[in-house]
């Protein structure tokens, strides 16, 4: 996907570098960061995701912080959730029993590269079709005006 993003960025570079786009992007990102830090339950999902990533990477030890810790002193519920998150991932998902949890990543990257190639071909086809229809429309317009 990163290759497709690079191709897309080069294609639409002028639009991406406009002042209006940059200002709206900065405002949106700031707004999202503020809202994310205000909602403690998003932190619960974030902690679970981080613990999963650490387990897949083969971490020797995982410590999950209570989800409400950045906002207020942690409650007994948030401490219990933090304590049990890594245990649930290890016992119910059997992440500890897997020898190489990220072993199939090469195949996903291969499929991603195939998708990029197909998307780029579709973009090229759409651009050529658009140019072709523009030529036809222009010809019809000229014929209708008697040129």
From Swiss-Prot:
GO terms for cellular component: cytoplasm. Signal peptide: none annotated. One of its GO terms (biological process) is propionate metabolic process, methylmalonyl pathway. GO terms for molecular function: cobalamin binding; methylmalonyl-CoA mutase activity. Gene3D superfamilies: Methylmalonyl-CoA mutase (3.20.20.240). To methylmalonyl-CoA mutase. This is Methylmalonyl-CoA mutase homolog. It comes from Alkalihalophilus pseudofirmus (strain ATCC BAA-2126 / JCM 17055 / OF4).
